[in-house]
């Protein structure tokens, strides 16, 4: 696919503080590329930087993940009745939802900590 040639230039005025904040938010990416993606609603690649978590919380999350994997393997092995599997799958889905909410909360907290 041939990249489109960009022929129009967009100029905006910002304060020194706004410029610094924009540079910080683009996390080392080219500012123009980042702004284009954000303004046009295109996905912006994460920097990979995750918030710092307390080691006990990390250990607990790792243990939860291990338990979920073991449970999923057992469910998939066919050792349980279909009724049991339905209940376990429903519980796993609820746990997955809770973990997603926790992950979002951790990311939001990390974003606040970086501000």
From Swiss-Prot:
Xref: Pfam families: MobC (PF05713)
An example Gene Ontology molecular-function term: DNA binding
Keywords, ordered alphabetically: Conjugation, DNA-binding, Mobility protein, Plasmid
DNA-binding keyword on record: yes
Matches recorded under InterPro entries: MobC
Function: Required for efficient mobilization of ColE1 plasmid and is thus essential to promote the specific transfer of the plasmid during conjugation. Probably functions by inducing DNA bending, helping the MbeA relaxase to melt the DNA around the nic site and cleave the phosphodiester bond. Binds specifically double-stranded DNA (dsDNA) containing the ColE1 oriT but does not recognize the inverted repeat (IR).
Protein family (similarity comment): To E.coli MbaC and MbkC.
Assembly information from the UniProt record: Homodimer. Interacts with MbeA and MbeB to form the relaxosome.
Comment on protein domains: Consists of two domains: the N-terminal domain, which contains a predicted ribbon-helix-helix (RHH) DNA-binding domain, and the C-terminal domain, which comprises a signature shared by nicking accessory proteins.
The name this protein goes by in its record: Mobilization protein MbeC
Protein encoded by which gene: mbeC
